């Protein structure tokens, strides 16, 4: 089937600063922090604003993923090419994810953020994490894998389970590709539906500043900035590790691929600020698909790599899992041998898959990992409850950057990247990023 052309060249434009999306979101985040700090009770009442925005985006995630993956596979035509792109993606995801897990372990061993806490697990009240522990114990590795299979085709989309939607999308894409010319009308109809869904997303994203304001006001109002000071060592270590991972590991990968990681970050600044405000990378999945296409990446590759990366390429979550696990071991004076640490890394390689970009998913995944590791008391995750919300932003930001880099790298490896579009974008990342805002008329 014919490859649908990449979107037309970007028309750069200038507009008043107060109309620029990232400026609006940044102001909203600052106002949210101030409201939450000075008027915590009022800040907590603003939670529906953040929840409402996330819910609006989440209602579009399943149909957007379905359309992009199905069209991405069916438009490739050559099923060997589909398999090649899929295999390259999985190898890349697993390699970089393993590096992220190892980096978390290494930094945790070197900096020892949990040293000196001397917490007795018997004194920890497990009630605050009972829900997470129960959910983690119910979802063993086999149950986790079996949960990928939905009860029904429509049910997967209705529930919005990312892995289930991916499964039916991949199967549908292959089925349409097998139909040959007879499948082209179906692929075209799905492409038209995708355009409609992206149009809805553009409308929803206009209220992103309101969502970011409400989410940040609630976070600061409910948990307080004081909780940050109590566990500043862990928070600081995690943020530092994530920044170094992005600049050094992802930076090296980007340099080898022929672009600057800093310019790439500038290009997706709007999406990063929305993620910062909402703590969920899922809120910008549709925008990332469009931005990667405008960057010059092939539409079919983007349609495969970005959605699957949201389940299988979670660099920030991986760093958090091994670093937080070591922190809890150190804080409870639980000695781990090198073999036990390697065992944690191996278990985390499995449990981290499918921890989608939903806010709080990293904490549930950590509980699932600890439920399989008998050495560290699982109730010790109660120590992290008060600060997890502040760490979820960093997880989501790192996940988002990692997925964008993966998409560019795999497009290059397939010879499916428009180098001229990439170089133009990297030369003017701020201006071009601004031109792609909702209503920007790219």
From Swiss-Prot:
<keyword id="KW-1003">Cell membrane</keyword>
<dbReference type="GO" id="GO:0070778">
    <property type="term" value="P:L-aspartate transmembrane transport"/>
</dbReference>
<dbReference type="GO" id="GO:0015138">
    <property type="term" value="F:fumarate transmembrane transporter activity"/>
</dbReference>
<comment type="function">
    <text>Responsible for the transport of dicarboxylates such as succinate, fumarate, and malate from the periplasm across the membrane.</text>
</comment>
<feature type="transmembrane region" description="Helical">
    <location>
        <begin position="20"/>
        <end position="40"/>
    </location>
</feature>
<dbReference type="Pfam" id="PF00375">
    <property type="entry name" value="SDF"/>
</dbReference>
<dbReference type="InterPro" id="IPR036458">
    <property type="entry name" value="Na:dicarbo_symporter_sf"/>
</dbReference>
<feature type="transmembrane region" description="Helical">
    <location>
        <begin position="233"/>
        <end position="253"/>
    </location>
</feature>
<keyword id="KW-0472">Membrane</keyword>
<dbReference type="InterPro" id="IPR023954">
    <property type="entry name" value="C4_dicarb_transport"/>
</dbReference>
<keyword id="KW-0769">Symport</keyword>
<dbReference type="GO" id="GO:0015141">
    <property type="term" value="F:succinate transmembrane transporter activity"/>
</dbReference>
<comment type="similarity">
    <text>Belongs to the dicarboxylate/amino acid:cation symporter (DAACS) (TC 2.A.23) family.</text>
</comment>
<feature type="transmembrane region" description="Helical">
    <location>
        <begin position="209"/>
        <end position="229"/>
    </location>
</feature>
<keyword id="KW-0997">Cell inner membrane</keyword>
<protein>
    <recommendedName>
        <fullName>C4-dicarboxylate transport protein 4</fullName>
    </recommendedName>
</protein>
<dbReference type="InterPro" id="IPR018107">
    <property type="entry name" value="Na-dicarboxylate_symporter_CS"/>
</dbReference>
<keyword id="KW-0813">Transport</keyword>
<dbReference type="GO" id="GO:0015366">
    <property type="term" value="F:malate:proton symporter activity"/>
</dbReference>
<dbReference type="GO" id="GO:0005886">
    <property type="term" value="C:plasma membrane"/>
</dbReference>
<keyword id="KW-0812">Transmembrane</keyword>
<dbReference type="InterPro" id="IPR001991">
    <property type="entry name" value="Na-dicarboxylate_symporter"/>
</dbReference>
<keyword id="KW-1133">Transmembrane helix</keyword>
<feature type="transmembrane region" description="Helical">
    <location>
        <begin position="160"/>
        <end position="180"/>
    </location>
</feature>
<feature type="transmembrane region" description="Helical">
    <location>
        <begin position="90"/>
        <end position="110"/>
    </location>
</feature>
<feature type="transmembrane region" description="Helical">
    <location>
        <begin position="53"/>
        <end position="73"/>
    </location>
</feature>
